[in-house]
Amino acid sequence: VISERRHVACQSLVLSLALSLLGVAHAADKKPTNDKLPDWAPKPKPHVIEDRFRLEVMTLSANLDTDIRIDPNLATQGTLINAEDDLGLDDSKLLPLVELTLLPGDRHLIRLSGFSVRRSADQVIDKTIVFDDQTYLPGERVNSTLNLTSFGLTYGYSVVKTQRIDLALTFGVQIVEIEANALVRSRVVRDSETGVTPLPLAGIEGRFDFNDRWSFEGRVQYLSVELDEVDGSVLDARAALTWRMNPYLVFGLGYRDFHVKVDSRDIDDPGIFDMKMAGPLLFMRASL
């Protein structure tokens, strides 16, 4: 009898252990995974933070090349001059640049950008220059100023968005203001011109993540327009290698090329302005 009781007890113990193991296995099967988390569970951190706000501060070591011609009228052309060679303006400059990007959705971006190039020089010219309705003679000392200010508004939509690739089409407008001034103090000869031109842009930009830290970014915007009185074109391109310190802070080293050309046949401001600006770029981007 005792043997039978021990046998029954052993059978009960084995059955209880088996049921316990089945329960544990069943619970393990129902354990949530990262790809099937309940709504209340915290989601895993993304490969790159899905931010909604970016502030980018840049320094551009720009090489500058500027051709300019201000005509007295539509029938008479002025002198085409190179601002760096003929007027002595700086052909290189360290420029601060700022961009603010808003990301209202998973695939949308709105970017505000702007920069200013301000240069002045005092040089004795070696040729006759017709600038608007003034004539500057060889041997005269000319005080010149040439300023360019650019503001841009861009909208982008990501047509391809994966874990490592983000490719967007962009549309925007670049407002370019040009201010030119030339002064000969000995003859009290002075002329000043200002022009503002809005230029629409279309482009493409993208990012490829090599890993959690390193990425390659590139963008290009370009458009050429021909209106009744003004022809213009803008090219704004850049490429950069970036290093992500943490999900909120990125450092980058790249190259930027900016080229604006305006050919005006407007009766009030006829002439040509052609400026190329290119050089290495260092930037820091903060994300929130």
Per-region residue spans from a language model:
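Bacterial N-terminal signal peptides
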Residues: 12-21
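Short glycine/proline- and aromatic-enriched beta-strand/turn motifs that initiate or cap beta-hairpins
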Residues: 28-117, 281-287
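Transmembrane beta-barrel architecture of outer-membrane proteins
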Residues: 52, 93-97, 148-152, 197-201, ...
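Residues on the lipid-exposed face of transmembrane beta-strands in outer-membrane beta-barrel proteins
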Residues: 57, 98-102, 153-157, 171-173, ...
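Transmembrane beta-barrel strands of outer-membrane/channel proteins
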Residues: 57-61, 112-116, 169-175, 206, ...
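Extracellular/periplasm-exposed beta-strand and loop segments of Gram-negative cell-envelope proteins
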Residues: 65-93, 116-148, 176-196, 225-229, ...
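Repeated loop/turn-to-beta-strand initiation elements of outer-membrane beta-barrel proteins
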Residues: 107-110, 163-165, 212-216, 247-251
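Detector for outer-membrane/organellar transmembrane beta-barrel domains
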Residues: 166-168, 175-179, 187-224
